[in-house]
Design a protein with these regions (language model features):
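Conserved GHKL (Bergerat-fold) ATPase module
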Residues: 1-173
């Protein structure tokens, strides 16, 4: 059972898939420590704007389960936080090249704390968010750091910037 962003209660995967929109390709999920923390993540706002249901993974094993299962009833799992949401026309084109100088400056200023700086396709009202792309997620990194720190598994740190946000527009001016 997983907490549903739209139903506001625990639901099964079968219930989630049964409610999916006809054109929805993925089972969207977001991982975090608490339902409240996940509910306030900036990375989920585009899915919420499109009235997409998000499963909230609060148990350390949940993300591993999605990674092992890969699909449920022919619907792949997709992280709302770390992957491309593939919402078609809802996403603006990659503007990283247009803002290359600003992004290079931000990355250089942050030193080794981020691997990449790019224009966000997820943010609407928030100025920035941190994502990990595909592969090791932040929740997996926390888990492995706690149980097997010698592995040194690290999530890739991608700083996504809302290029339409007043804070970025003021920075760029």
């Amino acid at each position: 059972l997983f907490y549903s962003s739209t139903e506001k209660k625990l639901v099964t995967l079968a219930e989630y898939v049964g409610r999916m929109k006809e054109d929805q390709k993925f089972i969207y999920y977001a991982s975090g420590d608490t339902v409240e923390a996940i509910d306030h993540m900036p990375q989920t706002e585009l899915l919420k704007e499109h009235s997409m249901e998000i499963l909230y993974f609060t148990d350390k094993a949940d993300e591993f389960l999605a990674d092992i299962l890969r699909t449920y009833q022919d619907k792949p799992f997709r992280s709302a936080i770390d992957g491309d949401l593939e919402l078609g026309d809802a996403q603006k084109p990659d503007e990283t090249e247009h803002y290359k100088d600003a992004f290079d400056f931000i990355k250089e200023t942050l030193g080794g704390r981020v691997d990449t700086v790019k224009a966000s396709t997820k943010l609407k009202t928030h100025p920035v968010c941190l994502t990990s792309g595909e592969g090791v997620t932040f929740e997996m990194e926390k888990y492995f750091t706690a149980v097997q720190p010698e592995l040194g598994l690290k999530a890739k740190r991608i700083l996504e910037i809302n290029v339409d946000h007043p804070a970025f527009l003021a920075f760029e001016a």
